[in-house]
């Protein structure tokens, strides 16, 4: 299981707000495009796509279990999986399942952006929208466990988020 029915319902409610997740992120999409070119990736999965704004800039398959029009699970693998501002929203007891799922979709590379601070948004049940608020060191340990044969470059690009660039060394 990747998400509980209760949490999926809370997130569907949050995503119905036209302002939630609608921010354009051209600078981020440029960085993803550069990493795709550097790693010679042709296909891209936007995992946890929200409103799927990445598709306006990059040829991405959009998947998000909390947005009905993007909830169809993709078939097969992609050269790269981008998962931006998603992992901190995952239910802690299901994080392993989600990371295994991401790894299963990624043939060559991953581009992850993970917030390390509480969200401004609150779920309808009163919890902060970021269910996992952990520092870079914690994420580095978790990601290294789930991507053991990958070259991971983890940077703390600003005080509130980390960026992870992962390249598969061919062993999966």
Predicted regions and their residues:
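A short His-aromatic
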Residues: 89-90
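Conserved N-terminal segment of class I S-adenosyl-L-methionine
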Residues: 1-80, 96-100, 105, 124-172
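Conserved beta-strand signature within the Rossmann-like core of class I S-adenosyl-L-methionine
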Residues: 106-117
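Short acidic/histidine- and often glycine-rich active-site loop of Leloir-type glycosyltransferases
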Residues: 120-122
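A short beta-strand submotif of the Rossmann-like class I SAM-dependent methyltransferase core
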Residues: 80-86
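Short hydrophobic-acidic sequence motifs that mark active-site Asp/Glu residues
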Residues: 62, 83, 111
